[in-house]
Amino acid sequence: MAKSKNVVGKAQRSIKLILILLVAFAWLIVVMMVLNNNDEKKQQKLLDSAQTLMEDKLYIRAYNLYQEALTNYQTKENPKIEKDLLDICKEGNLKAEYYQLIEKRIEAGTAEVNEYVEYANYQLEEGSAMTAVNTLSKGEALFDDDTLTQLYESVKYGYNAYEIKYSDIKTPSKDWIIPANDGTKWGYINTSGKVVLDFTYEEATHFSNNYAVVKIDGVYTLIGTNGYWYAVDKNDLDEVTDICGDKVVGVKDGKYRIYSYTFQPLSDVDFENIYLNDNGVIVAKKDGKWAILSDKLENITDYVFDDVAVNDLGQVFYGDYAMVKDQDGYYGISRDGKPCFDTKFADAKGYMGGLIAVADQSGKWGYSNGHGEIVIDYQYEDARSFSYDLGAVKYAGKWGYVNRYNSMMIENDLQSAGSFISGMSLVTTKAGETKVVTLKYESLFE
C-alpha cells in the first residue's frame, strides 16, 4: 500500500511540474507578444516620421529613419520595410545607398533577380567587370531568368589576346609551355611569346609533369623545364610521339611501343598506334582495331573500336570519358569501355569536358550533350568540342567561338581556333597572326 501511495505521489508531482512549465511558457509567449507589439509600434512610429520627411523630399533623412527602423527592431515587417527602402533610394536618387543596400541583400541571399541584374549593370558602368561577373554568377546559381543569363553570358567571356611571333607551334599541355619552331630549330616559349628554352632542338614534344622529350644531335632526350637533361634514349628510336606522366610513346621501324620516361621498354608488344591519357589508361591500335588498356598494359576492352576521336590535348580521354567509333558510328564511352549513350554519330571530335562536337551524314557539325542528345543543331562547316563553356566553330570559312546557347562570343573572323586549355587557346587571325587568347575570368569555369 505504501509503495502505491509513493507512485501516486510522484505522478501528482510530475503533473504539477508540467502544469507549472506550461503556465510559464504561456506567460513567456504573452510577454514576447507584448514586446513584439511594442517593437512594431516603435518601428511604425519611425516609418511614419520618415513618410512625413518624404513629403518634403527629404529623402536622406527618411532613409536614415528607415535604417534605424530596420536596425533597432526585428519584426515580421522588416522584409517589406527593406524593399520599401529600395524604392525610397530610387525615388530620392540615393545611388550609393541604393547599391549598398542591394549588395547587402545579395550577401544575405534576400535579393530578387532584378537586383542582381541592376547591380551588375552598375558595376559594369563603374568599370568593375570582374565584380559584375561574380555578381551575375551568384544570381545564376539562384535564378532561372533570361535577362540575367543573357547579361551573364555577354560578359563572362571577356578575353585578352596576345600575339606571338612564331607561327610553327604545337598545342601545349595544361602548363602552357609552348613548343615553337623559329624556322630552323625547336624551342619553347611562354604565352607572351618570350623564349624560355632556346631554339636548339631538332624535335620537341609538349611538357608533361615538368618533362618533355626533345631530339638533340639525333638522340631523343628527356629534359626538365630548366632544359637540364634527365635521360637519353638507348633504343635508337625513330620517333617519339607523346609523353604523359611517367610514360612516352616511341616508334621504331614503324612499330609503336610504350617506354618509361627514362626510355626503358615497358613491354615487348608492338602496336600500330598509341595514345596516352592523363587518367592513366592507354588507347592502343592493333590489326586495325583499337582497345583500352590499363597503365599496366592489361586489356580493359578487346580490340573492338574502329576509330577513336583525339582531342586538342592529343588524348582520347578527357577525365573518364571518350568518343569512339564502331561500325554504326561514333559514341561516348567511360574509361571501362562501356557506352554512355545509344546515339551514334557520323563523325565526332575528341571530348574536352563539355559539349561534344559531332557531325551528321552531310558533314555538317553541331553539338551533343553527355546523353547523346543534340543541343546545337548541325550547321557548321567544322567544330571543336566545348571546353571552358566555349566551342570553336567554322562558319562561312572563318572560325569563332560560340556558347551553349549558340551565340557567337568571340567573333568568327579567325583562320583557325583551338580548344581552351587552362583558360587559354591558340588562334590564327585573318591577317595570319598567331595569338594566345586568354579568358579574363577563368575561375568561373572551374
PLM segments and residue spans:
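N-terminal Lys/Arg-rich, disordered targeting/topogenic segments
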Residues: 1-14
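Helix-centric, low-specificity signal for extended rod-like, repetitive segments
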Residues: 6-9, 20, 98
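Hydrophobic membrane-insertion alpha-helices, especially the h-region
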Residues: 16-34
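Hydrophobic single-pass membrane-insertion segments
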Residues: 31-43
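Residue-level detector of conserved, function-critical positions
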Residues: 40-67, 78-446
